Amino acid sequence: YKTHYSIWALLGSPLMIGCDIRNMNDATRNILMNRDLIAINQDAMCRQAVKLNGIWAGEDMVMYSRNLSNGDIAIGLFNLSENKSAARFNLDELGLPQSTGHTLEMTEVWPKKTSTVTNGTWIQELDAYDCAVYRAKVVKA
């Protein structure tokens, strides 16, 4: 459910649910009520995410990015393989080369934790069929 809901949010799709919400378990409820992910989906800019061409650990790792109305960037990494894998992308791919003196402060929405991109490269290891979604803010390096 997490991967499915995450891609819907990034693509700006309607967030509909096809289960009896009175009887859903806590894990499902936590996914469907993730306020950070809903905020990305409902962003006022109404832009859809675009697929990026990253330096992948394999063709089963996919990355999407979506510009948000306040200048943040929503980033989704999706491991579509049956093996643990690492995704790597350079800030150049998001239009933020190191020469600008800026980097990204990445706040993960599953779970909520913040870290900063160093040396212009972000590496994220994901379990099989897992995903990571970030709300990234441009900050001084």
Placement of each model-derived feature along the sequence:
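C-terminal beta-strand-rich structural cap/linker in extracellular carbohydrate-active enzymes
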Residues: V117-A141
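C-terminal functional modules
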Residues: L37-L52, M61-R66
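Aromatic/acidic polysaccharide-binding cleft in carbohydrate-active enzymes
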Residues: Y1-D43
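Active-site proximal loops enriched in glycine and acidic residues that flank catalytic Cys/His/Asp
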Residues: L77-N79, L91, E108-W110, A136-V138
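Hydrophobic, well-ordered secondary-structure elements that form the walls
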Residues: I75, M106, Y129
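Solvent-exposed beta-hairpin/edge-strand motifs
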Residues: E93-P111
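Short beta-strand and strand-turn-strand segments in soluble, beta-rich domains
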Residues: W110-T118
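Carbohydrate-binding surface patches
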Residues: K2, W8-L11, M16-G18, W56-Q98
